[in-house]
Design a protein with these regions (language model features):
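Strand-loop microenvironment adjacent to phosphate/nucleotide-handling motifs in alpha/beta enzyme folds
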Residues: 3, 121, 151, 155-177, ...
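N-terminal Rossmann NAD(P)H-binding glycine-rich loop of SDR-like oxidoreductase domains
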Residues: 8-29
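Rossmann-fold scaffold of SDR-type NAD(P)-dependent oxidoreductases
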Residues: 12, 79-88, 129
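Conserved glycine-rich Rossmann-like NAD(P)H-binding loop of the short-chain dehydrogenase/reductase
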Residues: 30-43
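Conserved residues in the N-terminal Rossmann fold of short-chain dehydrogenase/reductase
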Residues: 38, 65-66, 106, 200, ...
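Conserved Rossmann-fold cofactor-binding substructure of NAD(P)-dependent oxidoreductases
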Residues: 63-84
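Hydrophobic/aromatic anchor residues within beta-strands of the central parallel beta-sheet
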Residues: 64, 104, 167-170
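Conserved Rossmann-fold NAD(P)-dependent oxidoreductase catalytic core, especially the SDR/UDP-sugar
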Residues: 87, 91-151, 155
C-alpha cells in the first residue's frame, strides 16, 4: 500500500458494498485518510458505528461528507486536499433506471462530469471510475447511462495532462453478494421458506467477488493509462447454475421458480465489444483498452492509413469460462457473507 502512504482517498458512493470492501482492505494500512462521500446520512452513521466498533484504533481515518454527485458545489467542498478518487456513486438498478432514465443520466453521466471537473480543479492525481458490463452494447437505460459515463471519462482524459490527473475506468460484471444483488435475495427467500425466483435459467452473467472488484480497481490505479478501460478476465455461469449452487449449499431440495426476464435485461452480458477487442492489450488476468488518441483532424489519418488491429472477438458471458455448480459453490464459500449465513442456517 506504499502508493497510498499518508494519502487522502475519496470514495464517492462510499457507503455501498464497494466502499465497505475498500475500508476493510485499507484502514489498517499506512493510508492517511479515507473520505466517504454519499447522500445517505443513515448509511454513513451506520458505517461510522460499525468501523468504530470493529477497528477503533484506525476508525478516525474515516471522514464522512454528505453530498450528491449531482451537486457540483457539494463535490467541490469534499474535494479539497484529496489525492486519489475511486468514483463508485451510481444508479445501478436496471429496472428502476428503465422507469426513471433521466435520473440515471443525472447521477451516472452528469454526476461523473461533476466529480471529474472538481477533481481536476483540485489537482487530484489519480481517479478510477467504476463502470459495468452493461455499458457494452447497452440495451437498457442504466447501461446506456454508464456507456455515456465512459465517454465522459475518455473525453475528460483528453483535456488534462496525465502527469497532472490520470483518469481511467474499470468495467466489471455481477459482484456476488453486493448490495442489491440476487444472492442475498435468494438466501432470504430460502430462510422464509419461499421458492427462490430466477428470471431465465439459460441467461449467463459474469461473476466476481467484492475482493476481486477491489483488486481490479487497484490494478487500474497502478497500471492504467489515462483514458483506459480495464476489465478482468472474469468467469461466468448461467442463472440456473448459480441458483442450484445457492440452494445446494442451503437447501438442496428447495424450489426454484422461473418468473421471466425483467425490464431491460439481456440474455448475456459483454465486457469487451468487438470494436474494443480490436485494440485491447492482454495483461494476463486483465484486458486494457486504450482510448483513441486521435483528434478531429481526420485528413492526416487518411493519409497515414489504419493502425494494426487485433483479431479478438467480443468478450462476453457466453464465450468466457462457464463454471459448473460445484465450481460456483467453491466461489460462494469464499465469501464471508455466505459462510456467515450458512453457519446461522445450520444452527
Amino acid at each position: 500500500m506504499s502508493l497510498f502512504a499518508n494519502k487522502t482517498l475519496m470514495i464517492t458512493g462510499g457507503t455501498g458494498s464497494f466502499g465497505n470492501a475498500v475500508l476493510n482492505r485499507f484502514l489498517q494500512t499506512d493510508i492517511g485518510e479515507i473520505r466517504i462521500f454519499s447522500r445517505d446520512e443513515k448509511k454513513q452513521d451506520d458505517m461510522r458505528h460499525e468501523f468504530q466498533a470493529k477497528m477503533p484504533e484506525v476508525a478516525e481515518k474515516i471522514k464522512f461528507y454528505i453530498g450528491d454527485v449531482r451537486d457540483l458545489a457539494s463535490v467541490k467542498n469534499a474535494m479539497h486536499g484529496v489525492d486519489y478518487i475511486f468514483h463508485a456513486a451510481a444508479l445501478k438498478q436496471v429496472p428502476s433506471c428503465e422507469f426513471f432514465p433521466i435520473e440515471a443520466v443525472k447521477t451516472n453521466v452528469l454526476g461523473t462530469e461533476n466529480v471529474l471537473t472538481a477533481a481536476i480543479e483540485a489537482g487530484v492525481k489519480n481517479i478510477v471510475c467504476l463502470s459495468t458490463d452493461k455499458a457494452a452494447y447497452p440495451v437498457n437505460a442504466m447501461g446506456t447511462s454508464k456507456a455515456m459515463m465512459e465517454k465522459v471519462i475518455v473525453a475528460k482524459s483528453r483535456t488534462v495532462a496525465p502527469e497532472k490527473t490520470k483518469i481511467c475506468c474499470t468495467r466489471y460484471g455481477n459482484v456476488m453478494c453486493s448490495r442489491g444483488s440476487v444472492i442475498p435475495l435468494w438466501v432470504e427467500q430460502i430462510k422464509a421458506g419461499n421458492p427462490i425466483t430466477i428470471t431465465e435459467p439459460s441467461m449467463t452473467r459474469f461473476i466476481m467477488s467484492l475482493e476481486e472488484a477491489v483488486d481490479l480497481v487497484l490494478f487500474a490505479f497502478e497500471n492504467g493509462v489515462s483514458g483506459d478501460i480495464l476489465v478482468q478476465k472474469a468467469p461466468a455461469c448461467t442463472i440456473e447454475t448459480l441458483a442450484k449452487a445457492v440452494t445446494g449449499l442451503f437447501a438442496p431440495a428447495h424450489e426454484i421458480k422461473v418468473i421471466g426476464i425483467r425490464h431491460g435485461e439481456k440474455m448475456y452480458e459483454t465486457l469487451l465489444t468487438n470494436e474494443e477487442c480490436a485494440n485491447a492489450i492482454d495483461l494476463g488476468n486483465f484486458y486494457r483498452v486504450p482510448s483513441d488518441k486521435r483528434d478531429l483532424n481526420y485528413d492526416k489519418y487518411f493519409k497515414e492509413g489504419d493502425i494494426e488491429r487485433n483479431v479478438l472477438t467480443e468478450f462476453n458471458s457466453n464465450n468466457t469460462d462457464l463454471l459448473n455448480v460445484e465450481q460456483v459453490k467453491e466461489k460462494l464459500l469464499s465469501l464471508t457473507y455466505i459462510r456467515d449465513e450458512l453457519a446461522a442456517w445450520k444452527k
